[in-house]
Structures are given as structure tokens and as C-alpha cells.
Design a protein with these regions (language model features):
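A glycine-centric feature that highlights glycine-enriched low-complexity/repetitive segments
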Residues: 1-99
Length: 99
């Protein structure tokens, strides 16, 4: 027989804290989007234009990857919160059954 020991309150607290971190991460990425994707060439020459375009392309790729990371993070937070509730309900049911 296997036993699982959890602390649903700790899981819930961790989910809340991680949710806040995710919101902060998303806000910072949104704030950085315009200045990093809209890089203006330093001069009117071809090299400056290509360099600015390269920086902008890199920033756009970063925004795509950051959006994927935010989605994975949100799924993790939701799973953690759901698991916390499930463990708490199971603990309550076991306590009621044990009397």
C-alpha cells in the first residue's frame, strides 16, 4: 500500500505565488515588446537598417517564445491549484470516513 503526504495549503499558496510571478512576467514582456520590436536604424545606411531589422526579428521571436512559456506556466499554475483542491477534498473525505 502506498501513502501520499501533501499539504494542500502549501500547494495553494505556491499556486497563488506562481500566478503572481506569471502576471509580472507577462506585464514585463508586454512593456518590452514595442521598444524591442520597433528598433530604429542608427543611421540611413544599409548596415544600420539590416542590423535594426535583425534586432527586431530577434525580439519578435522572443515574444513568440515568451508567449509559449507563459501558456505553459499558466497550465502549470492551474494544475497546481486544481491538485491542491483535490488533495484538500480527499483529506476532508478521509477525515470524515475515519471519524
Amino acid at each position: 500500500m502506498s501513502f501520499v503526504t501533501t499539504q494542500p495549503e502549501a500547494l495553494s499558496s505556491a499556486a497563488t505565488a506562481l500566478g503572481g510571478i506569471g502576471l509580472s512576467f507577462s506585464a514585463q514582456n508586454a512593456a518590452a515588446s514595442a521598444p524591442t520590436t520597433g528598433v530604429v536604424p542608427a543611421a540611413a545606411d544599409e548596415v544600420s537598417a539590416l542590423t535594426a531589422a535583425q534586432f527586431a526579428a530577434h525580439a519578435q521571436l522572443y515574444q513568440v517564445v515568451a508567449a509559449q512559456a507563459a501558456a505553459i506556466h499558466e497550465q502549470f499554475v492551474n494544475t497546481l491549484a486544481t491538485s491542491s483542491g483535490s488533495y484538500a477534498a480527499t483529506e476532508a473525505a478521509n477525515a470524515a470516513a475515519a471519524g
